[in-house]
Swiss-Prot record:
Locations listed in the record: Mitochondrion
A GO CC annotation given for this chain: mitochondrial matrix
Species annotation: Drosophila melanogaster
Function: ATP-independent protease that degrades mitochondrial transit peptides after their cleavage. Also degrades other unstructured peptides.
Cofactor(s) the protein needs: Zn(2+)
Molecular function terms from GO: metal ion binding; metalloendopeptidase activity
Name the record gives this protein: Presequence protease, mitochondrial
Amino acid sequence: MLKGGMLSRWKMWSPQYKILRNHLINFKSVSTYKNISGVNTKQPKSPRQFGCMPHVTKKRKYKYEEGKTYHGFQCERVEHISEFELTSYTFRYERTGTELWHIDRNDSNNVFSINFRTTPFDSTGLPHILEHLSLCGSQKYPVRDPFFKMLNRSVATFMNAMTGPDYTIYPFSTMNEIDFRNLQHIYLDAVFRPNLAYFDFLQEGWRLENKDIFDKQSKLVIKGVVYNEMKGAFSENAQVFSQNLLNNIFPDHTYRHVSGGNPLEIPKLAYNDLVEFHKKYYHPSNARIYSYGLFDASKTLALLDEEYLSDQSWVDNSYSLIRQQERWTQPRLVHISSRLDNMGTTIDRQNQIAIALLMCDATNIQESFELHVLSEVLIRGPNSPFYKNLIEPNFSGGYNQTTGYSSDTKDTTFVVGLQDLRVEDFKKCIEIFDKTIINSMNDGFDSQHVESVLHNLELSLKHQNPNFGNTLLFNSTALWNHDGDVVSNLRVSDMISGLRESISQNKKYFQEKIEKYFANNNHRLTLTMSPDEAYEDKFKQAELELVEQKVKLLDEVKIEKIYERGLILDSYQKAESNTDLLPCLTMNDVRDPPKWPKLFIQNVQNVRTQICKVPTNEITYFKCMFNITGLSHEETQLMPLFCNVISAMGTTNYNYREFDKHILLKTGGFDFKLHLIEDVRDSKSYSLSVMINTHALNNNVPEMFALCQELIKNVRFDDSERLKMLIENYISYISVGVASSGHLYAMLGATSQVCDAGKLKSLLYGVDHIDFMKNFVHSTSTVDICDKLSTIASKVFNKDNMRGAINTTQSYEPSAISNYEKFLESLPTFGKTQTSRNIHYLDPSCQQYVMNIPVNYCAKALFTVPYLHQDHPTLRVLAKLLSAKYLLPVIREKNGAYGAGAKISSDGIFSFYSYRDPNSTKTLNAFDETYKWLRANQNVIDQQSLFESKLGVLQQLDTPIAPGNIGIDYFLYEVSQEDFESYRSRMLSVTIDDLQCAIENYFGKESMHYGKCILGPVNANLELETSHKWIINN
């Protein structure tokens, strides 16, 4: 999600993308909810009734004491969790039973969230649309879309709202306390006292409206932000598969419905049903409130008591409880259809299969943790049974995104899924799955493989995340939603110790779990999916019939009312809001830049090395970058593949299984990334580099460097069968999910029309890379590819073209440098090669990547000035202003796209984009009319909108950075802390006159170097509607 471009994330059920890191059942929307005002006479439950008696704690000084009451909140439980250096406080509001979980931790990035258990009873998307409407104005802030308006009145590090399968959460985070209190007021008023205006329902949910609202004779169509969002979501096959897996393995309760909304069911939602749902499910007794960080929790308790909870009474919220799924007596098989993906593999291989098993109750914390570890042992890496038996035989494109263990639902699940396989291989997959389970149950696992999984988990506990508070919230939400013990769930070290103890006492511990949960489990779903070439046509026909059914019920009076309502909505959307009602920071609140540790530059064995001494929790982080600009064009195009497979091929001294085992036992893994970096001073040249990123516990640093040395000196590309499998999995991986990131691909496609560096970026990261890889593999033998990758490896790791960076603690720094020196001693040196290439700018052009999906992703890119040019911060402020004042109101609110915005990158490319957009040429026209709008609406650029736009930029500039990544901008771009502070100061000093000058200089006349790009369905009238020639990529 691009902050400021999209309102919410509807969380699709997908175990592999669980946040630790995200069908046509016809049920009438319930409209007979009981009014809660009649049941307020019951007394709040006691702590015993809630199953949470005061917890006995050790003698430690705490800010709040168990059993005491603070602003109406009784403190029920206090615990210190040493592994995360935090103290957990559990409060419960005595009048309503509302639980508040406060995490006190020395972390400047503070978090707040209001969570509700929202169980859908149909697929109209009611909880999802309510989430949107709640943020469209409230009693205290009767401003249309205060959420979007606060994006630029805040320096939040995160602001969003999310609808999951059975919950809705409203989280934000910020490092500024004034900002924190402002956003608390906005969010609390939004959820407890929203306006829920009917016209916001029409805008955000769905409406029947004339295609051209000013033409009474134009046909009636369905519009709406969520409606278009979900059309986009259901155009992605991976999402369709994940959603159907959830619906079919839990067929008896709320999970059988689509919480985000099925596009063909959304138009069945009535506005009154949504209002009634809010009264019941957003009651404080059904809420859970989370706060995290350094800020005073007593202020939060007082605010809740005085303004939102004291006039409420307890209600029994058992109506929202999710019961366990009744277990099946026989396994089930379900087959579904999907769209033909023209960017995917051949039609005969565009099939997917998943075998899913229902596991344990999510609230059984130790059991769920152990099943999670067991799942990793079964599927993770080349030493796991399923990888060996399902992936290495190479009859598929590898695991699909549903693979893994998930605790996102009341009952946890384990899934193994494959993508890009033939229908005739479904049977083979099932047979291999069964055989793998039986063999694992009988033979057990290699102890080192199990230990490598546990080590990786332990290392992740030490790894510091700048968004720890948000991560903790997202990891805990599902468990908390089912009344699980979220505090005990933080004691991961205890759970690991408990598991190790169980394994040591019973050598068949995991084997017995496999017998119980895998071999003898009848609650097993096999879901298969195959493409239907008529899938999109069938959806369009169903949508057309839905509209026709609704139109048949209309007489002339109702049709006239729809026309008039469309005009009223248009006026409603254009009306000016009194944003003075909203809180806003001042310049004094944000003037000081964040302080970062000093970077030291040393020449270590003739290698420029950046050193940062910083508290890293006993971890050393190492990055090294090799300039590869001198590679040939073909070799450069193969670098993304090279980066993907190099650590999976094995070395001279270790086969790939042994090497993977050593990596996981001693390090956090080796990540290879290709970087194309333009000169941020003048954008006249660029360089190409490959960066290796790894980290390890301090006591494993010698082994980390030894393994890195082994890999880059002795990697082998002689196993053609393994490489063939890795290549096919890689192509399958990059081909999946294009639509879900369609705006990013569209911006890359537009940039590729601006300059040759942009064209190369698209060939390395964009849709063009997918096409290149397919064609290259088709025309080149695997043996030849082995030879080409070996040649690349012999050229890339040149000590003369290397730079290094080490982030570690001050006390360990001498040891880290000593081990680093030994690592450098063995690296080959064969002279400096070409280190940069000149950038050439291109004539304007337009291109479309045709996709058989029902929405568009549009982009326009033009060259302006790079990061260190004096006008760059002005253009960055302008991009924020355009997003908030022009693009979002026109493209999102009025025209129905899910998201839209503008941005400028460090290379000086200024981009416009839209996301899940029902329009294409209409949106491109809006991009083109930017200058016209700016000149016609000069009054919009006032001191307040200027300051708000600066705050939007500060959200990005002042974002928290993990200890392991401090100094990354200098390492990649040679942007120093002094450069950064100068840039930040210039940005804050931008005036209205500066903006006006930038508007004239960069938008007053059409840029000499621009490009346009659309990802979306065929448009036969594209050239006619745009008056441009288009390159069409089918």
